[in-house]
């Protein structure tokens, strides 16, 4: 029984790696060589496949260990990748914007290879939960936090892309010369087509994605606060992880408000979102390398 | 008074609000970089004046501005109060007035105005019915007027931000009250001994147990607890980590544990209770050790215990292991029989009196719902007939892309 599951796990791991590599190559081939358009379908398809295999990896772990697979760094990174891929698949379906897959596939491939190749074997094994983590809140708090991280990462990546493209445009490279130009979004041709250019699309898409990640982050932080209050009697203790989650929340709150300020159009909110990208990563990984505080479970023991 | 009004006017500005948010973020980050709540010597030693961190953080600066306790320093609390004021002002002077129907439903009389419509479409269809039907199908609410049709959807997206601000104010005020009015106390309670705790409460521990999993690691801590109030009512519950006892405004949490005494019997007649000392290992190891030196019949031995499973390790003065004994087992030392009878444990509990938890939780609940609903985009559409052509005007506050896509589709269907 154990052997069979181990094989499924290894097999899914290899397939994930392979499909993400294929997806990365096909998306970027499509971007660089404007003429071959069908590669995007290969990219999109393999992204979906990678998402499914990660679901299998996490699913077998869930069945094996009996609790939601978010107890160590490896599982948490895999879940983050799952969130990134899932959001990318959804957004791409909604907008037909292949740039999303093109930016999400390299970052996913990087995370997956880091977690399977660089993490020591014993850190990849599912470990029994310490008493403090034995709670239904684990699933609620950690999964919502992870989903919010992945949504916010995609949202802020789109904002960074927007900044890069706008800088390129300002440097007199017309966007037409840019390899991405063939992705310019056009509505069905008719008398009433509104020209919504790539930059505007990216800008609005990153706003909407962050706008969705933000309530998730709020719910995740609150679930953590309520859990902390149930487990050790205080809902806020300025633990580094908590504090950085709050900082992330504040930065994205500032971003969302900047969007509705008339004097803050265009680039300035995007800079805040780019700052948010850095802050999310500090919150998710950086804090744990300090090895202090209440959130140091399942990491570098 | 004038100054206050001027000050409040300055504060009532989105850019200022954004700066406050970022200032709190920066201050919070500072508190995770500089170690908090250490003694003065620590800062003098680690942040010398000669070698400032980031070229400006020195012990002088830290101590002067309370950077050793950022989150309770006067200026951090001042920032929080500024945020509270800014939230309240924004809600009263901007958000609530904007909720008036007249401002929500913008009935333009002249559609040539330069009002910012994201959409200005023209269709040749002469009837509004078809367009209205499509809009209704997309969940728009329709209002018919003499010369135009007004449609809107997503009103929650307009109302929710107000509730977000309101619930943040509740959470901030609630947690301020919690920290100033609430009380906590940590106590170790020896099994089978009564102990008075906070106010009129007394706690009694029937039993304390540690459950281990198959790999020998700690699975859970259980304290079988009785809480007695002055009214002589008794509440019994087995609490564990993540499962506290709640009664009225008191909550009791499982937080820690200790082994206090080892009961030893010599030659089957004399019983002694030996206090054990908890030893903290310098390398921050997870294992715990309790230790005591026994002088028995001219020989010194060290008893070492590291959990409640009842295994006692005996070492001689040269730190060599003499024997491993379990409770109740007879061992012989210098011709005497020794039995370890019992380990006396105590459970570390945290007692908390806080009447403002429900208020904070109410804020939490409202905040979760309202931030989620704030995602909704508030969209408005005007259909105006002019002879044989129909004009479609539209505006939305958040999902511009999806809105334009949707209306383009509707317009093309006609």
UniProtKB/Swiss-Prot annotation, chain A:
Superkingdom of the organism of origin: Eukaryota
Alphabetical GO biological process terms: cytochrome complex assembly
Membrane topology value: Multi-pass membrane protein
Membrane spanning stretches: 13-33, 39-59, 73-93, 97-117, 146-166, 209-229, 236-256, 270-290
GO MF term (any one): heme binding
Gene Ontology, cellular component aspect: chloroplast thylakoid membrane; plasma membrane
Keyword terms, alphabetized: Chloroplast, Cytochrome c-type biogenesis, Membrane, Plastid, Thylakoid, Transmembrane, Transmembrane helix
Pfam families (UniProt xref): Cytochrom_C_asm (PF01578)
Record's subcellular location: Plastid, Chloroplast thylakoid membrane
InterPro entries in the record: Cyt_c_assembly, Cyt_c_biogenesis_CcsA, Cyt_c_biogenesis_CcsA/CcmC
NCBIfam families membership: cytochr_II_ccsB (TIGR03144)
Function: Required during biogenesis of c-type cytochromes (cytochrome c6 and cytochrome f) at the step of heme attachment.
Subunit structure: May interact with Ccs1.
Similarity comment text for this entry: Belongs to the CcmF/CycK/Ccl1/NrfE/CcsA family.
UniProt protein name: Cytochrome c biogenesis protein CcsA
Organism: Guillardia theta (Cryptophyte)
Swiss-Prot record, chain B:
Name this polypeptide is given: Cytochrome c biogenesis protein Ccs1
Membrane-spanning segments: 14-34, 73-93, 159-179
HAMAP family found in the cross-reference section: CytC_Ccs1
Keywords: Chloroplast, Cytochrome c-type biogenesis, Membrane, Plastid, Thylakoid, Transmembrane, Transmembrane helix
Gene coding for it: ccs1
PANTHER family xrefs: CYTOCHROME C BIOGENESIS PROTEIN CCS1, CHLOROPLASTIC (PTHR31566:SF0)
Record's bilayer topology term: Multi-pass membrane protein
Entry's localization field: Plastid, Chloroplast thylakoid membrane
Binding partners and assembly: May interact with CcsA.
Family listed: Belongs to the Ccs1/CcsB family.
GO BP of this protein: cytochrome complex assembly
Gene Ontology, cellular component aspect: chloroplast thylakoid membrane
InterPro entries the record matches: Cyt_c_bgen_Ccs1/CcsB/ResB (IPR023494), ResB-like_domain (IPR007816)
Protein task: Required during biogenesis of c-type cytochromes (cytochrome c6 and cytochrome f) at the step of heme attachment.
Presence of the UniProt keyword Mitochondrion in the record: no
């Amino acid at each position: 029984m154990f052997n069979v599951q181990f094989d499924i796990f290894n097999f899914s791991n290899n397939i994930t790696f392979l499909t993400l590599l294929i997806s990365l190559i096909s998306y970027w081939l499509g971007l660089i060589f404007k003429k071959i358009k069908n590669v995007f379908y290969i990219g999109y398809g393999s992204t979906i496949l990678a998402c499914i295999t990660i679901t299998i990896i996490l699913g077998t772990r869930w069945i094996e260990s009996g609790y939601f697979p978010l107890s160590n760094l490896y599982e948490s990174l895999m879940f983050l990748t799952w969130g990134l891929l899932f959001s990318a698949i959804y957004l791409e379906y909604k907008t037909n914007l292949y740039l999303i897959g093109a930016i999400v596939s390299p970052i996913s491939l990087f995370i997956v290879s880091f977690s399977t190749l660089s993490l020591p074997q014993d850190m990849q094994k599912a470990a029994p939960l310490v008493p403090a983590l034995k709670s239904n809140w684990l699933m609620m708090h950690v999964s919502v936090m992870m989903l919010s991280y992945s949504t916010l990462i995609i949202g802020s990546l789109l904002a960074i892309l927007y900044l890069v493209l706008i800088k390129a445009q300002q440097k007199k490279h017309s966007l037409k010369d840019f390899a991405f130009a063939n992705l310019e979004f056009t509505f069905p041709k008719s008398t009433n087509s509104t020209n919504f250019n790539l930059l505007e699309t990216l800008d609005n898409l990153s706003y909407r994605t962050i706008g969705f990640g933000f309530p998730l982050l709020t719910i995740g932080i609150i679930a953590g606060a309520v859990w902390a209050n149930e487990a050790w009697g205080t809902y806020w203790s300025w633990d580094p992880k908590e504090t950085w989650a709050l900082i992330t929340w504040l930065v994205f709150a500032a971003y969302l408000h900047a969007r509705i300020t008339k004097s803050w159009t265009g680039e300035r909110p995007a800079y805040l979102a780019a700052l948010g990208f850095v802050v999310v990563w500090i919150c998710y990984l950086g804090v744990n390398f300090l090895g202090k505080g209440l959130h140091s479970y399942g990491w570098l023991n | 008074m004038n100054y206050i009004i001027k000050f409040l006017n300055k504060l009532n500005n989105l850019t200022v609000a954004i700066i406050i948010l970022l200032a709190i973020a920066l201050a919070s980050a500072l508190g995770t970089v500089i170690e908090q709540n250490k003694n003065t010597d620590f800062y003098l030693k680690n942040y010398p004046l000669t070698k400032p961190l980031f070229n400006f953080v020195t012990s002088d600066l830290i101590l002067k501005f309370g950077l050793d306790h950022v989150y309770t320093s006067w200026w951090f609390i001042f920032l929080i109060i500024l945020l509270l004021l800014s939230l309240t002002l924004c809600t009263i002077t901007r958000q609530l007035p904007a909720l008036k129907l007249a401002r929500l439903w913008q009935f333009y009389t002249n559609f040539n105005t330069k009002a910012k419509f994201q959409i200005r479409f023209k269709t040749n269809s002469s009837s509004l019915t078809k367009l209205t039907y499509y809009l209704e199908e997309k969940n728009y609410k329709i209002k018919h007027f003499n010369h135009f049709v007004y449609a809107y959807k997503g009103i929650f997206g307009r109302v929710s931000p107000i509730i977000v601000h309101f619930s943040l104010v509740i959470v901030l005020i609630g947690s301020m009250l919690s920290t100033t009015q609430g009380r906590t106390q940590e106590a170790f309670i020896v099994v089978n001994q009564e102990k008075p705790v906070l106010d009129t409460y007394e706690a009694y521990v029937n039993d304390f147990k540690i459950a281990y999993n198959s790999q020998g690691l700690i699975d859970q801590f259980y304290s079988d607890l009785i809480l007695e109030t002055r009214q002589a009512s008794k509440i019994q519950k087995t609490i564990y980590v993540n499962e506290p006892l709640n009664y009225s405004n008191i909550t009791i949490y499982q937080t820690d544990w200790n082994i206090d005494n080892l009961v030893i019997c010599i030659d089957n007649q004399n019983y002694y209770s030996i206090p054990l000392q908890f030893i903290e290992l310098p390398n921050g190891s997870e294992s715990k050790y309790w230790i005591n030196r026994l002088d028995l019949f001219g020989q010194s031995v060290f008893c070492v215990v590291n959990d409640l499973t009842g295994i006692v390790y005996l070492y001689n003065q040269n730190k060599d292991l003499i024997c491993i004994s379990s409770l109740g087992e007879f061992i012989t030392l210098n011709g005497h029989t020794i039995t370890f009878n019992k380990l006396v444990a105590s459970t570390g509990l945290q007692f908390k009196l806080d009447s403002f938890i429900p208020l904070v939780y109410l804020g939490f609940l409202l905040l979760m719902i309202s931030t989620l609903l704030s995602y909704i985009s508030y969209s408005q559409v005007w259909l105006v007939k002019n002879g044989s052509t129909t004009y479609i005007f539209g505006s939305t506050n958040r999902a511009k892309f999806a809105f334009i896509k949707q209306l383009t589709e509707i317009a093309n269907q006609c």
